[in-house]
Every structure is written in structure tokens, then in C-alpha cells.
């Protein structure tokens, strides 16, 4: 049987489905959860819920949830533990309990559908395809093969997710993404796609991106910078996307202090660099980090710096020094910045 048929039969024997999104879910994760929920409904599961943790702070992600009216509930540990027989737990766009999610390590997972690199997947149903550009591509394949009702909301969600995850089919896109988009295109709401593609940007996000630009240092073709302390988590990937287009830059890494953690976002077009592996090597011993060859992220608890100082300015200086040093070591770079660096970042 195909993966779609195997999944459908597995779902048809269950009575309840809990879908857990990864922390701070993006459109690929959200659209995949929406599609899996529709498949579960078609398979006869009446009790379904989608849980998330972290923030949906990116303007595009907020618009995605609001305009498509996606029903989400805050993560509840009780929902994934001590489950009744016939109750299934599913991960979409992530794969391992405790890795980029709040599910306790060791929790049994029934379904995993993902395209991110991972070597520790353990579930009854696993469809793990690193070669595809988006998890939504896999779910679109299921929807198509199983003849699930493709209404405007689902088609728009899946198509936008694929476009966003592949940066308009320019990053990691395969033939599968184009095939999926061709199938979804006639069913999607074009006006809604335009609204999702051009959300408003907050002043705080612009300020954070401006700080990243000001603090940049460049070594070879690698740019490293920080946004200081911010509440705008999604300013980091937006800054990384923008700074990766700077002339002479192939890799851009942006970090910042958010609440009690250091968040890291990276983008790379350098064929010699697997930025996900580089971040994992640099931070796996103190936090969680990893991702694809071209895009990756990470999180390091601020608590490991708590013994140094309680002053935010001093703390930022220490964080900048330590995080930058680990990045330089992970990428085999020297500590001497080039002339492209911002003057204020090297004074």
C-alpha cells in the first residue's frame, strides 16, 4: 500500500487524534495539521484537536491562522500523556518528542510526517522525506490520492505553505512541489493568497531588523549579527532572509534574546555549507539546533549565562561573544571581521 493508504487505514481504527505542532508553528506545520485533520475526519475520527506551543508572532503566520480560521488550542501535557486506547498522537513538520516541541521526551508518538533531517524517529506510522521541500507537499499527495474534499480553505493553506517554505519555489523545491501546486492552484483563493503574501509589519519588527543590520559583522561570505533583546521572535528569520541577499554574503545568521532563551535563525546559499549541521554542531551540547542545508534555527537557554550577570547590557555582550565564538568554530572561520561589517559592530 502507498503511505496515504496506510495512514488512512491506521486512522480508521482510531477514535481520537491529537496533532501537535512544533514550537512557534509556521504555515508548513499549520497547513499540514489542517490537512491531516481533514484526512482523519474522512477516516471517521470525530474527536480531533491541534495543539501548539510558543508564539504565532510572525505577521504572516498570524494572518494565516486568522484569515483561514484555523482552530488551534494551547499545548496541554495531559493531552499527550495517559491517552485512552484508540487515541492517536501525531507530529507534523517535526519528529521527536522534546525537540522543538513541549512534548515530554520518551512520549510514545503514533504518527510522524516530516521533511526535516532527523535520525531518531520512532512512531507506528512514519513518512519522513528529507528530499521534498515542504511537509505540506506530502499532505497534498495524501489529499489527492485519497480524494479528500479539497475546499478553498484547505487548498489555499497548502499552496501558501508550499510557496512560503520554498521561498516561492526557489529554496529546496522539487518536482513534487510543482506537482502539488498544480493540483492546488485551481482550488485556491487568489485574493487570499495575496493577502497572506503581504501582511502588515509591526514597528517593533522593523526596529529589530534595523538593529540586526547595524550589528552585522562579515567574515568571508558569512554574516553574523544579533537583534539584542526583543519580543519579535520572527524578526530573526526575516532579518536572516534579508541579510542573506547582501552582496558577497552567502550565509546569514541572526540571533537575539527572547524571554529566557537565545533564538537563532540562519539562511545559506553556499553549496559548501550545510547550515543545519553547522548549527547542530555548534549548539547541540547547550541547547537544540539544526535544520536543512539552506535554512536552520536553534534555541539556547539563557539560564546557562545566569551566573555571569543580571544586567541585560552586560548579558548581551557575553551572549554576543559566546554565540559568535561557537558559530565561528562551527563554520571554521577566523575571528577577524571583514570590511563589510557595520562600523558600530566592530568599534
Where in the sequence are the language-model features?
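Haloarchaeal acidic low-complexity proteome signature biased toward cell-envelope/secretome components but also
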Residues: 1-16, 78-93, 100, 111, ...
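Short alpha-helices
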Residues: 113-180
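Short glycine-rich anion-binding loops that position phosphate/pyrophosphate groups of nucleotides
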Residues: 24-25, 94-97, 116-118
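Gly/His-enriched, cation/cofactor- and phosphate-binding structural elements
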Residues: 5, 12-17, 22, 47, ...
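Glycine-rich, Lys/Arg-enriched anion-binding loops that position phosphate/diphosphate groups
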Residues: 166-237, 244-251
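His/Asp/Glu-rich metal-coordinating catalytic cores
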Residues: 57-85, 89, 93-104
